[in-house]
Design a protein with these regions (language model features):
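S-adenosylmethionine
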Residues: 1-172
Length: 172
């Protein structure tokens, strides 16, 4: 299958991955991307949105679904109202990791964090997951060093409706 990737890249990747994994990659790289969404439960608790947008659940992230056919999200007022967030399923894995970390802290007799920093937060998917997963008493700072991206981050955080997130635009 022709992937449009540079020949040298394909050769090196094939060598690193081995023939079996390379075949899986090359067979799937030209497939249309899979779309997924994360529901904002306080805004769509009745789950009616699941039947209109979502298809099958993302295994590692609560309230997340694959979309069978990608709609025109920019025309959907529910998306603009923050009822759901369009997000790549692999980036939702942060919820699974955070759940594990919080459970480990609990088992070790340590307190949950009271302050968390998302250092490069735009466009906001990770921050939204962090805010939904962290204890209510935890304050989240979502920083984005690039001004234009920080504006998008702020807009997405506002849409989601969490007042306990501070959006900043700072370099380390």
């Amino acid at each position: 299958m022709e992937t449009g990737l540079p020949f040298a890249f394909k050769q090196e990747t094939r060598k690193l991955m081995g023939e079996q994994l390379w075949k899986v990659l090359s067979d799937n790289i030209d497939e249309p991307p899979v779309t997924s969404v994360r529901l904002n439960m306080p805004k769509c608790g009745n789950l009616r949105i699941v039947t209109t947008v979502a298809h099958s659940p993302v295994a590692w992230c609560r309230n997340s679904y694959y979309v069978e056919k990608r709609p025109n999200f920019t025309l959907d007022p529910l998306m603009h109202a923050g009822a759901y967030y369009v997000q790549e399923a692999s980036s939702m894995f942060v919820e699974y990791c955070l759940d594990y970390a919080l459970e480990t802290l609990r088992k070790d007799g340590l307190e949950s964090p009271s302050l968390v920093l998302d250092l490069c937060a735009a466009p906001g998917g990770k921050s939204l997951i962090l805010r939904d997963t962290l204890p209510a008493s935890c304050l989240l700072f979502s920083n984005e060093p690039i001004r234009q991206r920080a504006n998008i981050l702020a807009e997405n955080i506002i849409k989601h409706g969490n007042p306990d997130v501070v959006v900043t635009n700072n370099y380390a």
